[in-house]
Amino acid sequence: MFIYVDESGSFVPATRSDSWCVVAGYVVPEVVRKHVERSLSLLKRRVGCAYQNELKLRHLSESQLGRFLGELGDLESTLFISAIDLGHQDPQVVFAHQRKQVDSIRANRPNMLYEEGRASIDDLSGRLERLSPQLYTQMVAQVDLLDQVFRMATLYYAQRLPATLGSFKWRMDEKNSARPLFEQTLTHMAPALIQAKSLREPGISVEGFDHSHFDKCFRM
């Protein structure tokens, strides 16, 4: 499967409610990827947008958007969203949450037998500590999204297109590559946070669903 991830919003603290910021992941089985790309190409052509340019919502009429969503709805693709209203978040609580994560990483330093391990702890905790509050908030939302995809997409496609679970190919928003601290911190933090959550809240496996492709590629 291909998972296209993008965000909307600045993730900065807000003084009023309805200040939503969103990270979304659109999951496309490889067998229908060309159909999705064709629908997007036709939509851009209809509104006069060059294929290499990003299409914004303001470029579309309601009918054009409805038609495009209808085309996507006919495919076995799925959409996952992690959203947060910054108008209801206390900046001090966000800071405390970030501080707690940093401290929890550093707590493992004495357990490292070798200098390489201690250096890795120092590097990761330092990266996390240097994230701005808005990038930390975005990272938390993005990790939540990735966890959703792993938990729910596996259940969905194990019933419909089991072979889709043999590969997860992520396509992140290119803006993240211009923010190396964010991208590198997310890359290092996401696997550990998702694993920790799976230990606290194990994912669901349903007897009779076909997980064979997933198990073959990812089970130890």
Regions found by a protein language model. Give the residues of each.
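An N-terminal structural lobe/cap that precedes and organizes the functional/catalytic core
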Residues: M1-T78
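A two-mode feature
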Residues: A83-M220
